[in-house]
Design a protein with these regions (language model features):
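Short secondary-structure transition hinges
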Residues: 69-109, 117
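Membrane-interface starts of transmembrane alpha-helices
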Residues: 122, 126-130
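Hydrophobic alpha-helical connector segments
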Residues: 34, 38, 45-74, 129-133, ...
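Amphipathic, non-transmembrane alpha-helical scaffold segments
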Residues: 32, 36, 40, 94-105, ...
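C-terminal peripheral helix-coil segments that are non-catalytic and often amphipathic
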Residues: 106-118, 131, 135-180
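Conserved hydrophobic residue
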Residues: 3, 120-121
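Secondary-structure edge/capping motif, primarily at the C-terminal ends of alpha-helices
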Residues: 50, 79-86, 144-148
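Helix-turn-helix
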Residues: 2-30, 34
Length: 180
């Protein structure tokens, strides 16, 4: 984790000199924060791309969920230190991702509004529904990353289950061919 990592370790891994690192960062914690911020910014970009795809809102909402879970999983696995800290110090990660969470919830709202306007979703309150959707997805991140959800299922079958739950919760009116 971050605590066991030295500035020398970081300098070697980044192929930079320690002096160079200290020019930009006062501590290894600042470097850690910069890495997390950078990863969250890339994640936001991926989410924005998914939300901007020219597909119907019912497909788009699933695309957002898949993008979120797969991207978080890749970030955590790509960064060994982040992986350890993600599971050990979830509160620190939580504080750092507030802006990402805000942007993601706004994307959910946008897609839910689209779906409601197109009469695809039967939801009473878009804002509350977006918040609930966001926290549901966030709540399954750790089991998803660890491969504990539907480990015996192939991806297509697993996502069909997700689609059924999501579409049911959103009162999805278009029933034919709703899965990705």
């Amino acid at each position: 984790g971050v605590e066991d990592t030295t500035m020398n370790d970081i300098a070697q891994a980044s192929k930079k000199g320690r002096r160079t690192l200290y020019t930009y960062f006062k501590s290894k914690e600042q470097i850690y924060m910069a890495v997390v911020e950078s990863e969250l910014e890339m994640l936001s970009t991926q989410m924005e791309k998914a939300a901007s795809k020219p597909v119907s809102p019912d497909k788009k909402i699933l695309e957002l969920i898949m993008t979120h879970l797969d991207a978080i999983k890749m970030v955590v696995y790509r960064n060994g230190t982040l992986r350890a800290d993600f599971f050990r110090d979830i509160w620190r990660v939580e504080a750092m991702r507030k802006e990402f969470d805000r942007k993601e919830t706004a994307l959910f709202r946008r897609v839910l509004h689209e779906g409601k306007e197109q009469n695809l979703f039967d939801i009473d309150n878009v804002e509350i529904t977006a918040d609930i959707l966001h926290y549901c997805i966030k709540g399954i991140e750790v089991p998803y990353i660890r491969g504990q959800i539907g480990e015996e299922l192939d991806d297509e079958t697993g996502w069909r289950y997700v689609a059924k739950i999501v579409y049911g919760a959103l009162g999805c009116k278009k029933k034919e061919n709703n899965h990705i």
